[in-house]
Amino acid sequence: MASEPHLRSHGADRVRQEWNTIGENELGIDRDVAEEIVDALNDELSGLYILFNQVRKHYWLLEGAEREDLGGFLEAAADRLAETTDALAVRVHALGGVPVCGPMGIRQHAPLHIEAPHHYDVRSSLERDLDGYATLAALFRDHVEHVERVGDTATGELLRERLVVLEEDAHVLERYLAEDTLVRREALD
């Protein structure tokens, strides 16, 4: 017997639009251009999903002296990542696309590697988070230029606004990672 995929289908008769297709949009954006933009936004969405889950994991596993202060930041940062994800997913839909969701779509568009499921020290975890923020910030910058070049200034503005949020959170992570900010393991031994 063949293995069934881990997807739950409601039946083909209930599908309004298939994943990876572009329908009409009311924004006046040509379908081919909308397809390019949706593909780019799905890259961002995939990275946001991965980084959100990674930041939440690091929040859950915090312990020690940094728990309260750093925990508050990571929890709020995850919320901001979720808000950015929602804003971009709504834009994908407005452009006539279906936002990336689920492991297969995320893997297809992933600009980040998924962190192994281990519990790492705080410094290593934050370095990994900062790397994810840097990767996404670079992707957002590239896509701002691209979408504005093809005439979608509204998506460009959305990406610019959300880029500022990513950069602000990355700056906070940089401060936590400053030489003497975090307790080092050898100091506890």
Residue ranges of model-derived segments:
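Haloarchaeal acidic low-complexity proteome signature biased toward cell-envelope/secretome components but also
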Residues: 1-27, 185, 189
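Alpha-helical bundle segments that constitute or directly flank the non-heme di-iron/ferroxidase center
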Residues: 16-24, 30-64, 126-149
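Short, contiguous alpha-helical
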Residues: 156-188
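Acidic/histidine-rich alpha-helical segments that form the ligand environment
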Residues: 40-41, 58, 90-91, 104-164
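Conserved alpha-helical segments that form or flank metal/cofactor-binding pockets of metalloenzymes
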Residues: 56, 62-105, 176
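Generic structural signal for well-ordered, non-transmembrane alpha-helical segments
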Residues: 42, 46-49, 75-86, 127, ...
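Short, solvent-exposed positions on alpha-helices
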Residues: 53, 68, 72, 153-157
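Long, contiguous binding/interaction regions
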Residues: 2-3, 99, 103-107, 134-135, ...
